[in-house]
Amino acid sequence: MKLEQRYEGKAKKVYATENPLEYVVEYKDDATAFNGVKRAQIVGKGQINNAITAHLFPLLEEAGVPTHFLEKLSEREQRVRAVTIIPVEVIVRNVAAGSFAKRLGLEEGTPLARPVVEYCLKSDALGDPLINTDTAVALGWASEDDLKRIRELALKVRDFLTPYFAARGIRLIDFKLEFGRTHDGQIVLADEISPDTCRFWDAATNEKLDKDRFRRDLGGVEDAYAEMLRRVTGEGGRDEG
């Protein structure tokens, strides 16, 4: 049973429960880009992201990646382990795209010879600036051991998801992960894996099936999210209500 709201972010609300070691997460339809500068609603996004995350996190657990996920409660809600989020976001890149391609003068779609792992400070106010391990350790955001474990888990996520999506006709271009620490100090994957946090391209056409359709005003955002839901879970489209 969910109690008072503990936190509201751009895409989710987090509620306390009767168990102090568990939260309820509610997924919203709110869409933001450029650290909240651009805002809109994507019909059914909350349901779709909840469903995709609830499908993928148990598979990642089986693949050896501990997560905060416990169970899907409803169309928009899931029960999770309570964690303290580590304020270092991890980006894993298989292909040059987005800010990475722009920053380095690369053509979007350029394959990378090996996965690139980048770290950002989790701060909308500062625009999620890139940081390195020395900065994270020096400023107390994470320890060297934390970052070593986070990198190990992020690459394990990549090694599982890349072929998983490929088998469904999807190229996993890059993705963002967040990790948290449980009450007993275990580092686990938190947040979500969805078209909000990943770049997905159709393997045959390179059509974008993710939030870039919203960021870049490409249209067809709801249809792209519904298509990802269908390919990942086999479920149908979105609820228009």
UniProtKB/Swiss-Prot annotation:
Keywords: ATP-binding, Ligase, Nucleotide-binding, Purine biosynthesis. PROSITE patterns: SAICAR_SYNTHETASE_1, SAICAR_SYNTHETASE_2. One of its GO terms (biological process) is 'de novo' IMP biosynthetic process. Disulfide bonds: none annotated. It comes from the Bacteria. The keyword Nucleotide-binding applies. It catalyses: 5-amino-1-(5-phospho-D-ribosyl)imidazole-4-carboxylate + L-aspartate + ATP = (2S)-2-[5-amino-1-(5-phospho-beta-D-ribosyl)imidazole-4-carboxamido]succinate + ADP + phosphate + 2 H(+). Pfam families: SAICAR_synt (PF01259). Signal peptide: none annotated. Its EC number is 6.3.2.6. It is an enzyme of class 6 (ligase). One of its GO terms (molecular function) is phosphoribosylaminoimidazolesuccinocarboxamide synthase activity. SUPFAM superfamilies: SAICAR synthase-like. InterPro entries: SAICAR_synt/ADE2_N, SAICAR_synt_PurC, SAICAR_synth, SAICAR_synthetase, SAICAR_synthetase_CS. Belongs to the SAICAR synthetase family. This is Phosphoribosylaminoimidazole-succinocarboxamide synthase. The gene is purC.
